[in-house]
Amino acid sequence: MKKQYCYIDGVPSIYWGNPTEKTFISIHGVGSNKEEAELFARIVETKGYGVISFDMPEHGERINEKNTLRPWNCIEEIEKVYRYAQSISPNISIFASSLGAYMSLLTFSEIKLEKALFLSPILDLQRLIWNLMSVYNITEAEIMEKGEIPTPAGITLYDDYYKYVMAHPITKWKTPTEILYGEHDNLSEYKIVTDFADRFDCGLELMKNGEHWFHTEDQLAYFSDWVDKLVTD
């Protein structure tokens, strides 16, 4: 398929396929990059969609950035890509995975998109942070005092990030949404996902033996079938 590298207002991006009236913005999670949207792009191209993927802060071409993967930075950059998508296509949808889903919830809380597909979404970052603090006996006062606290899980807790997340709970979501969740997801609690789905009338599919990171042959095949089923011409 056609694959065009570009910069959208300074953000390293790829446009997959040919320009069309229907566009998906692909928003990846931690440890991923814009190139990993290829499988998704190949599937939805057959349904008449183009796809824009981009590197989130500290990922892909931006791997050497430091301390830029903050919600306010991510929102600003998703908005840049969204504005560009609007300039070329009247119908905008999103595909987001893991932390990318959380950043999407913040960015588009007041906007009704055509549709959203969430894979292994982080839907309540407050809860995830609190769980991490509980496991490693870290208090809010310690985070505020030290500014940043590395954890054995490889995740560093920052005071500015913590304060932002606590001040911005997810209370609104207007976009018709479908969620694919793995039975053995170790980051997103099933109850959090089901509560979100019930609250915002989302479709939810559970993959038996699925994980947070869909990477095995069986998992990717299941994911592909899920996308193919939900995205129509």
Locations of the language-model features?
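N-terminal cap/lid segment of alpha/beta-hydrolase-fold proteins
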Residues: 1-18
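Active-site glycine-rich loops that stabilize anionic/oxyanionic intermediates
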Residues: 21, 29-32, 183
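Catalytic nucleophile-loop/oxyanion-hole region of alpha/beta-hydrolase
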Residues: 59-88
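Structural cue for short, hydrophobic secondary-structure segments
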Residues: 26-29, 53
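Conserved alpha/beta-hydrolase
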Residues: 41-63
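The serine-hydrolase catalytic nucleophile loop
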Residues: 30-42, 191
